[in-house]
Amino acid sequence: MQKTPFHLVEYSPWPLLVSLSLTSMPLGLIYYIRFGSIYLLLYGMLLTSIIAYMWWRDIVREATYQGHHTTYVVKGLKLGMALFILSEVCFFFAFFWAYFHSSLAPSIEIGSVWPPIGITVLNVFQVPLLNTSVLLLSGVSITWAHHALTEGKYYSTLSGLFFTVLLGVYFLMLQYGEYNETSFSIADGVYGSTFFMATGFHGLHVMVGTLFLFVNLVRTYYYHFSTTHHVGFLAAAWYWHFVDVVWLFLYISIYWWGS
C-alpha cells in the first residue's frame, strides 16, 4: 500500500543514459561544423531517441497499468505542462522581439525600409493563408476528439486524432514547399534570419506536436485513456493549441503586416 499520494520513482537507468547521449549531441554538432563529419551527431540523436522511447514507455506503464498517477500526480503533470508552454511562449517572444525591433526601425544598411530592398516577400493570400486554414481546422478536430473522449465516444476520438495528425503532416509539407519557393535564404540579412528562425522553429514545434498526437492516437487505439483519466491527451491538446496561436501571430505579424 502506498503511504503518500505522490509517485515515489524507483531506480532508473534512463536519466544517466540520456545525459550521456545529450552530451554527445552538441559535441557532434561542433565536430560536424569543424570537420564536416555528421556521424557523432546522428549517433547522439539516435541514442537519445531510443532512450526517450524506453523512458516514456516506463512512464506509460506506471500510469496506465500500475496506477501510480494519482490525482496529485496528475495535478503536478498538468502544472509542469503549463509551465513548459509558458517557457515556449518566452522562447517565441524573443523571435517576435527581434523581428519587430528590426522592422519598426529598419537600419540604413537595409535601405531604411521594411521589407529590405531586394527581398521579394511571399504572397500572404496563397500558401500562408492555406497553412492558417489547415492549423485552424486541426484545432477544431483536436477539440472534437477531446470532447468525444470525455463523452466516451471511442471511434470519434480516433477519427478526430487521426484527422489532426493528417493536417499536421499536411502543414509540414506545405511549409517545406513554401521554403523551396522563397527567393531569399536565412543568410539574406535580418529579414531572412528572423523569418526562417521564427517559422522554422514553429515548424519544428508542429513536427513535435504531430508526433505527440500520433502517440496519443496509438494509445487511444489500445484503450489507454478513460473519460476522466487522460492527462497525456490533454497535454498534447494544450500543446497543439499553443502551436495554433503562435502561427496566428506569425501569420499576422510576419506574413501580413511585414509584407
Curated annotation (Swiss-Prot):
As one GO molecular function, the record gives:
cytochrome-c oxidase activity
Documented EC number(s): 7.1.1.9
GO CC annotations on file:
mitochondrial inner membrane
Q: What keywords is this UniProt entry annotated with?
A: Membrane, Mitochondrion, Mitochondrion inner membrane, Translocase, Transmembrane, Transmembrane helix
The UniProt transmembrane annotation reads 13-33, 35-55, 80-100, 119-141, 154-174, 195-215, 232-252
One Pfam family this sequence matches: COX3
The record describes its membrane topology as:
Multi-pass membrane protein
Q: What biological process terms from GO does the record include?
A: mitochondrial electron transport, cytochrome c to oxygen
* Superkingdom of origin: Eukaryota
Any signal peptide, and if so, which residues?
none
Catalytically driven reaction(s): 4 Fe(II)-[cytochrome c] + O2 + 8 H(+)(in) = 4 Fe(III)-[cytochrome c] + 2 H2O + 4 H(+)(out)
Query: What broad class describes the main subcellular location of this protein?
Result: mitochondrion
Subcellular localization(s) per the UniProt record: Mitochondrion inner membrane
Functionally, this protein is described as follows: Component of the cytochrome c oxidase, the last enzyme in the mitochondrial electron transport chain which drives oxidative phosphorylation. The respiratory chain contains 3 multisubunit complexes succinate dehydrogenase (complex II, CII), ubiquinol-cytochrome c oxidoreductase (cytochrome b-c1 complex, complex III, CIII) and cytochrome c oxidase (complex IV, CIV), that cooperate to transfer electrons derived from NADH and succinate to molecular oxygen, creating an electrochemical gradient over the inner membrane that drives transmembrane transport and the ATP synthase.
Complex and partners: Component of the cytochrome c oxidase (complex IV, CIV), a multisubunit enzyme composed of a catalytic core of 3 subunits and several supernumerary subunits. The complex exists as a monomer or a dimer and forms supercomplexes (SCs) in the inner mitochondrial membrane with ubiquinol-cytochrome c oxidoreductase (cytochrome b-c1 complex, complex III, CIII).
Family designation: Belongs to the cytochrome c oxidase subunit 3 family.
Name of protein:
Cytochrome c oxidase subunit 3
Q: Which gene encodes it?
A: COIII
